[in-house]
């Protein structure tokens, strides 16, 4: 008698045939850094050998298949990043900015913001990352962009991911200083009590139109993200433990708290922001797609820089 109902489970010690989401991200980041750092269109063969010998890849021949697939996936990103960087070596900017902030009632405090920003090319700041960029990544680019603008830089800033480029138009040093000061005030407020601000959900909210409840529902996928693009555990901001402990959706997401804060942080950024596919980057950059002009000196809403708006704004950050 043959029993065909045996439940054969894989041993925990079996060799994997693929990488999980975090392992895939880290491997692609290594491949990107190696190629772009050397100005090459593909990673160095020595890195490939070291990766194979590290024991972190699947067994042969699946390691070769995996590496070839990842190199194919990141090739457009490498090419567009090298195009933006150009042949000149990237430089850095030393940041030193002084602010008088109303941190306590009736009294201002002087704050020194000091640091260094790398990866500055003749076309502006150029950052890149594997996978898809979301609200947190765009906010990080925005903060660096404001620091550079406040120091007198006059070029756009770019973030490239696997399928799109994200660009921020230059503004005057005075305007950047004002925006940074407001964000610093919020930073100090956040040290006193939690702020109802989630980068991805907030950006999706600001990118939508309509009444508060309608915009909140359109931003809901960023909070839940039950259908993760990674095909594994949910990665929505609502699944992060510190948010779960503090905020409940939609009870704590009122227009006066969540909505007003999202608008305060992201609305000035959205007026400078453009997102498009990597295939459109070369044409955009060669046509001097973003330049500093009088229209954006005091931009506070999405109409102030109509030519610079996100061409995919209807999709927001869900792309």
Task: Give the positions of each predicted feature.
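Structural signature of nuclease core domains in nucleic-acid processing machines
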Residues: 1-319
């Amino acid at each position: 008698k043959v029993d065909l109902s045996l439940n054969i489970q894989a041993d925990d010690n079996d060799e994997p045939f693929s990488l999980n989401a975090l392992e895939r991200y880290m491997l692609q980041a290594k491949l990107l850094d190696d190629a772009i750092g050397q100005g090459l269109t593909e990673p160095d063969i020595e890195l490939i050998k070291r990766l194979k010998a590290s024991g972190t890849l699947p067994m042969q021949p699946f390691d070769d298949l995996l590496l070839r697939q990842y190199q194919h996936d990141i090739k457009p990103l490498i090419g567009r990043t090298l195009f933006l960087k150009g042949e000149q070596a990237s430089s850095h900017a030393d940041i030193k900015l002084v602010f008088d902030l109303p941190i306590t009632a009736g009294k201002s405090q002087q704050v020194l913001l000091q640091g260094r920003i790398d990866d500055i090319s003749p076309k502006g700041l150029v950052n890149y990352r594997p996978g898809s960029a979301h609200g947190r990544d765009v906010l990080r680019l925005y903060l660096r962009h404001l620091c550079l603008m406040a120091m007198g830089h006059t070029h756009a800033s770019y973030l490239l991911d696997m399928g799109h480029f994200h660009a921020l138009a230059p503004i005057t040093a005075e305007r950047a200083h004002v925006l940074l000061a407001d964000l610093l005030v919020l930073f100090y407020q956040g040290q006193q009590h939690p702020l109802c601000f989630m980068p991805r959900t907030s950006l999706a909210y600001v990118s939508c139109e309509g009444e508060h409840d309608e915009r909140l529902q359109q931003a809901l996928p960023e909070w839940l993200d039950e259908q993760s693009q990674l095909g594994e555990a949910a990665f929505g901001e609502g699944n992060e433990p510190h948010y779960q402990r503090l905020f409940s959706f939609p009870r704590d997401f009122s227009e006066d708290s969540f909505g007003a804060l999202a608008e305060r942080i992201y609305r000035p950024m959205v007026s400078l922001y453009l997102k498009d596919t990597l295939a459109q980057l070369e044409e955009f950059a060669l046509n001097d797609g973003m330049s500093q002009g009088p229209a954006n000196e005091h931009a506070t809403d999405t109409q102030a820089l109509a030519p610079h708006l996100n061409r995919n704004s209807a999709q927001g950050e869900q792309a």
